[in-house]
Amino acid sequence: AVTNLSNVLKNGNDNFTARMFTEVVKNNPGKSIVLSAFSVLPPLAQLALASDGETHEELLKAIGFPDDDAIRTEFASKSRDLRSIKGVELKMANKVYVHDGGKLDENFAVVSRDVFNSDVQNIDFSKNTVAAKSINDWVEENTNNRIKDLVNPDSLSSATAAVLVNAIYFKGAWSSKFDERLTSDRDFYVSKDKTIKVPMMYKRGDYKYGESAVLNAQLIEIPYKGDQSSLIVVLPKDKDGITQLQEALKDPKTLETAQQSMYSTEVDLYLPKFKIETETNLKDVLSNMNVNKIFNNDAQITRLLKGESLSVSEAIQKAFIEINEEGAEAAAANAFAVVFMSAVVSQPLVFKANHPFVFFLKGDGVTLFNGVFHP
């Protein structure tokens, strides 16, 4: 039964990631984006445990969990697994800020701490500048100073009851690095016939590689030290195939299937160096994903604060990713047969990411971040 459960979180995250990705792409057409759907799950799961009635049902459905027990088991074990991933730095930090007069429900406080490793702090929201600074300093500290100014002081007031904050930070070195001397400015097709110059890294090496007819794309997996996390790049076969690819990825099974047909082979890999930051208004995005009730005045969030029923006033995500020769820093089937001719030297496959593509950063089998590179 244990394995079934961990599939609950994995499948819940895959579905949630696909849906959130679709919404964020819709809001940022033709742009580079990065998001961490995975880091939105803990606060939603916390709210599920603190809510009743339709609000509770809606949250369980959104994160793909059958019941509260599954949440308690899953998140406790997953946060342990992720904390022990080898070779990379991965930090997940959750915190609940509660208005000054409010007292946290004892059960909720225990679950927050034990299951989500989440701190709780009382704060005077009416002193909005001080409160915002306090929250933002905490976020900055927990994301290696990458995510700044998450909360706008104007969004806080004496009417604010609670603010849920989640931060995720990843830094990993490639198992084998790119040689900086081989990085050079090369053409990148921003559209079918318009190019710009981008710094393009190059490496010949053994990588897991695949092609997918359903996605009409090439895939490559670039491992980080410790081999428990990797970057998967999904490159459309057509230079202007990004929209079609995003459409195909709406079904989370397509990536899963494509990954299953990947195999190790020698590849000439060309990959741009890049840095992306995205701010996402989760209130808008979640509303489009059928999570509405927590934001309404009649939200049934009754088990977070003693004797008070709350609604969520604000939900924001800022995510960041940087990919370079050293590795990554992030704060958010069709088999292909190669026939060898005797006495002919085999040519490595070429994976040339010189037009917009989608990427997935995975740790311990779970997508932690994903996004689009579209300069």
From Swiss-Prot:
Annotated site location: Reactive bond: F340, M341
Tissue specificity of this protein: Hemolymph.
Recorded GO MF terms: serine-type endopeptidase inhibitor activity
InterPro entries attached to this UniProt entry: Serpin_CS, Serpin_dom, Serpin_fam, Serpin_sf, Serpin_sf_1, Serpin_sf_2
Keywords per UniProt: Protease inhibitor, Secreted, Serine protease inhibitor
Record PROSITE patterns: SERPIN
Matches recorded under SMART domains: SERPIN
Domain of life: Eukaryota
Anything else known: The N-terminal section (1-336) is identical to the N-terminal section of the silk moth antitrypsin I (17-352).
Entry comment, domain topic: The reactive center loop (RCL) extends out from the body of the protein and directs binding to the target protease. The protease cleaves the serpin at the reactive site within the RCL, establishing a covalent linkage between the serpin reactive site and the active site of the protease. The resulting inactive serpin-protease complex is highly stable.
Protein's name in the database: Antichymotrypsin-2
Lineage start: Eukaryota, Metazoa, Ecdysozoa, Arthropoda, Hexapoda
